[in-house]
């Protein structure tokens, strides 16, 4: 009653809390609350052997155990959106435990003073994001949908092999050629909508039986198809110390990486079965589409031209990154890639007559490169869109929808994100002691 007489409108003399809808944001927030603890235990054994004067062998194995204990809310939201407290009434605890053995082997063979051969074989893990493994679900009765995290996700496991040839010459500098391969099992990905067929809500997803015939909005799982990635890298570093006069201060570095990958991304379509009459029967039809590995550019290039003379040092560098496959999606037109990215940076420093004192100038993103993400699809209402593209696409009836999207120029695809960072200039003094 004190709150009532003090003018707090959220409390009245009514027998129930009639202003509950004003607290919708509070219960909605509580739904996504969670608590968690992660425990990592690692043990390893390693041997470092020199066999003769030319061969070095490093081998070992790491045993890694991970135990996660997470608590999250589960529940049902009824047809009235403001009664969301039901979605935060059940606190569930889930404990996950997994153990992996990660062997590694490194070989180095100095064939000659100017030639070194290297080999590496490693096994690495990619663990799921913690928000993806919470024991959380929120069922919408009105929309017949389920927000769902998947506590059964397991880490993706990658077997990596690298071959490296290094040539080192006093005038040539250091030239390294690398070939690498990766085979990834259990890559975590988003499969989009997933229909819960009758009788599988509890057995497959750990959901209440009444969630049968609902749809999971964003279903994340481990990819059942193995993924192959391969590529090569060229790295070159040199100083032109043998040139006459002031040219001997020139420095040049270059690095180029090329990768290719092929991934089968599972794709589930929800089909209607009319053969049994009404009510209709829904079924998941599982297939896949092929694309690149997500978050992996096809090309990366770094170039750096520098000059060192007495107390002066300067570097002009360029970074080029090819387009990156950023986001999977059930709908081909909503899959996203970035535009190719190129930026220039400048770094200068000069030692001053005071011991330990130097002046520096750093200019980042000189050309003011822009980050742009694009959908595969296009926006025909864009004033810059060329209508002739529509005619070309319509005439290619024998091609798949993916092939038609490949015909669209990148500049005509709809933007999903555009970020302008501009250039930054830092001028200052640094004192080291």
PLM segments and residue spans:
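Flexible glycine-rich, low-complexity coil/linker segments exposed to the extracellular/periplasmic environment
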Residues: 1-31, 194-222, 283-287, 385-417
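Short loop/turn motifs that connect adjacent beta-strands in outer-membrane beta-barrel proteins
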Residues: 53-54, 112-114, 171-172, 241-252, ...
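Residue-level signature of outer-membrane beta-barrel architecture
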Residues: 49-51, 55, 107-110, 123, ...
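Gram-negative outer-membrane beta-barrel transporters
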Residues: 181-183, 200-325, 430
């Amino acid at each position: 009653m004190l709150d009532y007489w003090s003018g707090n409108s959220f409390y009245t003399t009514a027998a129930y809390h009639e202003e509950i809808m004003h607290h919708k944001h509070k219960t909605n927030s509580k739904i996504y609350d969670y608590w968690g603890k992660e425990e990592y235990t690692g043990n390893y054994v390693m041997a470092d052997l020199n066999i003769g004067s030319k061969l070095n062998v490093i081998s070992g194995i790491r045993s890694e155990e991970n135990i996660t204990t997470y608590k999250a809310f589960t529940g049902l939201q009824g047809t009235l959106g403001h009664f969301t407290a039901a979605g935060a009434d059940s606190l569930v605890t889930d404990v996950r435990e997994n153990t992996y053995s990660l062997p590694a082997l490194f070989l180095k063979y100095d064939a000659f003073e100017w030639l070194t051969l290297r080999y590496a074989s490693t096994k690495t893990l990619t663990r799921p994001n913690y928000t993806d493994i919470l024991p959380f679900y929120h069922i919408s009765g009105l929309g017949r949908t389920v927000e769902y995290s998947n506590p059964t996700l397991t880490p993706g496991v990658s077997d990596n092999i690298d071959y490296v040839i290094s040539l080192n010459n006093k005038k040539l500098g250091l030239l390294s050629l690398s070939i690498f391969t990766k085979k990834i099992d259990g890559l975590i990905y988003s499969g989009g909508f997933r229909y819960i067929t009758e009788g599988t809500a509890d057995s497959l997803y750990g959901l209440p039986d009444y969630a049968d015939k609902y749809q999971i909005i964003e279903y994340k799982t481990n990819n059942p198809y193995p993924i192959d990635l391969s590529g090569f890298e060229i790295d070159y570093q040199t100083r032109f110390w043998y040139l006459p006069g002031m040219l001997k201060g020139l420095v040049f570095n270059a690095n180029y990486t090329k990768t290719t990958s092929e991934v089968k991304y599972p794709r589930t379509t929800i089909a209607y079965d009319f053969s049994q009459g009404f009510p209709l029967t829904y079924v998941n039809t599982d297939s896949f589409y092929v694309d690149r590995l997500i978050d992996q550019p096809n090309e990366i290039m770094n170039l750096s031209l520098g000059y060192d003379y007495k107390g002066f040092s300067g570097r002009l560098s360029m970074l080029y990154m090819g387009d990156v496959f950023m986001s999977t999606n059930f709908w081909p037109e909503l899959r996203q890639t970035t535009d190719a990215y190129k930026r220039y940076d400048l770094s200068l420093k000069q030692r001053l007559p005071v011991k330990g004192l130097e002046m520096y100038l750093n200019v980042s993103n000189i050309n003011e490169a822009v980050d742009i993400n694009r959908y595969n699809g296009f926006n025909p209402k864009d004033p810059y869109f060329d209508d002739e593209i529509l005619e070309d696409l319509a005439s290619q009836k024998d091609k798949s929808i993916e092939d038609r999207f490949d015909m669209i120029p990148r500049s005509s695809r709809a933007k999903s994100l555009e970020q302008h960072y501009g250039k930054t200039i830092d001028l200052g003094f640094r004192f080291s002691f």
